[in-house]
Amino acid sequence: MFREALTYDDVLLVPQHSDIESRKEVNIGNWLDESRGLWFNLPIIASPMDTVCGTEMAIEIGKMGGLGIVHRYNTIEKQCEMADQIVEQIGSEKFGCAIGITDDYLERATALV
């Protein structure tokens, strides 16, 4: 049912000689969801913290091939405005929005969809 996933503790990089002549030859892309065709060239997800991922960060990391998760530490209306700005710039499949688990999570999720 669940795909195998790796965390930082599962990976060890050992320095060694390489025949690669340019870092442009390396492909670090990966599927986020192969069944939906969600491929990311940059396998980095920006944390949904107000000091990390707002509108600008979500747009820029999306342009580079990563994924930004917009924080929820504002009103539902403001988060929807942020989402609209991001969709205008990079489309709807290159970012996400945190909704939390407290009082307004259902209203927030409904408004964002």
Where are these regions (language model features)?
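An N-cap/entry alpha-helix motif that binds or orients negatively charged groups
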Residues: 1-44
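Alpha/beta enzyme core
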Residues: 2-5, 11, 53-113
